């Protein structure tokens, strides 16, 4: 039996008006069973149910943060587990989705990296996170207008499935998201960055998890070599910008005594010369056994001031969902106060 959400909307079964009805049930109404699609003929519903399924999850658990963020812990039909994070703001609703079970990049300060790599998610398993979160929050799927591929996994190492998921997210008859509100984050896969630049029909935004401006420090905190060298990453970033004209976000997790020295701020400014970019400084979010601490507020401010004085567009990102284990770098299938529900 095929998973319907793995298909591009243009390849959905049924024809013409009936296909549009099917797409509306799935992506606008968020219906999870074919029986509920009452304006489709009974014969069509029966045939769909024989050939396709709509739900890749065996179980869904939630952990709610005091700041309104919600971590969703999904158990897939094969027993594997992964997570997504819902972040409501006054002016928007954002979701952070996973592209893998675990992650092969093994960033030393990231709880997901400590899990190791399980498997790639399919396009439908990525998209289904949005539908499941919308259902869990009692909102329509299209009310979630911002999406970041920043959950578990290195999206560039699951490239084809992630691109298919992005096309489904953007499709006007599916979730209809704006390409300007979808961001893909990578630890620095130069080949993938160049491939993304060539995806003319997408136009989604790019964020690079740099975390250090010098090779010695970067190899210490990203030890597996999943990413390219800083020089290779920045060359690919410049190629990407030359093709797309888009600003690139650089993510920089602040690790006390590791990558927060002022000479590293100066070097980072040098590395970014000529690139239209924005740097997000992210205080490290704690997790058991990490062996790292966040930089102090004073050191983060000094690092910020040094970059700003050099003309770098920079901000400090305050993570949400820390108390639920849902903040950046904390996703590791932990369940403080989880609430379980049937999928």
Swiss-Prot record:
The gene is rlmN. SUPFAM superfamilies: Radical SAM enzymes. InterPro entries: Aldolase_TIM, Methyltransferase_A, RlmN_N, RNA_MTrfase_RlmN, rRNA_lsu_MTrfase_RlmN/Cfr, rSAM. Binds 1 [4Fe-4S] cluster. The cluster is coordinated with 3 cysteines and an exchangeable S-adenosyl-L-methionine. This is Probable dual-specificity RNA methyltransferase RlmN. The active site is at 83 (proton acceptor), 328 (s-methylcysteine intermediate). NCBIfam families: rRNA_mod_RlmN. It holds the Pfam family Radical_SAM.
């Amino acid at each position: 039996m095929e998973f319907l959400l793995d298909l591009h909307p243009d390849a959905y079964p049924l024809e013409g008006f009936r296909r549009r009805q099917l797409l509306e049930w799935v992506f606008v109404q968020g219906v999870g069973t074919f029986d509920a699609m009452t304006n489709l003929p009974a014969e069509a519903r029966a045939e769909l149910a024989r050939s396709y399924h709509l739900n890749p999850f065996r179980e869904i658990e939630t952990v709610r943060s005091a700041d309104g963020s919600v971590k969703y812990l999904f158990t897939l039909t094969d027993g594997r587990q992964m997570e997504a994070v819902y972040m409501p703001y006054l002016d928007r609703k954002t979701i952070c989705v996973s592209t893998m079970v675990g992650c092969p990049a093994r960033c030393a300060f990231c709880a997901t990296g400590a899990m190791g790599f399980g498997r790639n998610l399919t396009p439908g398993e990525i998209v289904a996170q949005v539908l499941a979160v919308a259902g869990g929050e009692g909102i329509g799927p299209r009310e979630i207008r911002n999406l970041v591929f920043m959950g578990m996994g290195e999206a560039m190492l699951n490239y084809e499935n992630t691109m298919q998921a992005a096309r489904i997210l953007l499709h006007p008859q599916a979730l209809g998201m704006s390409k300007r509100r979808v961001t893909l984050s990578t630890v620095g896969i130069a080949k993938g960055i160049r491939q993304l630049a060539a995806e003319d029909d997408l136009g989604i935004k790019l964020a690079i998890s740099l975390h250090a401006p010098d090779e010695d420090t970067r190899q210490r905190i990203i030890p597996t070599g999943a990413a390219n060298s800083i020089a290779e990453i920045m060359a690919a970033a410049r190629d990407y910008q030359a093709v797309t004209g888009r600003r690139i976000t650089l993510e920089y997790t602040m690790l006390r005594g590791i990558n927060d020295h002022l000479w590293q701020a100066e070097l980072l400014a040098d590395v970014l010369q000529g690139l239209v970019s924005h740097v997000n400084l992210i205080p490290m979010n704690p997790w058991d056994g990490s062996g790292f601490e966040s930089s102090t507020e004073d050191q983060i401010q000094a690092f910020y001031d040094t970059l700003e004085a050099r003309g770098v567009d920079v901000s400090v990102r305050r993570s949400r969902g820390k108390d639920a284990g849902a903040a950046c770098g904390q996703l590791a299938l932990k369940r403080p106060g989880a609430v379980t529900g049937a999928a």
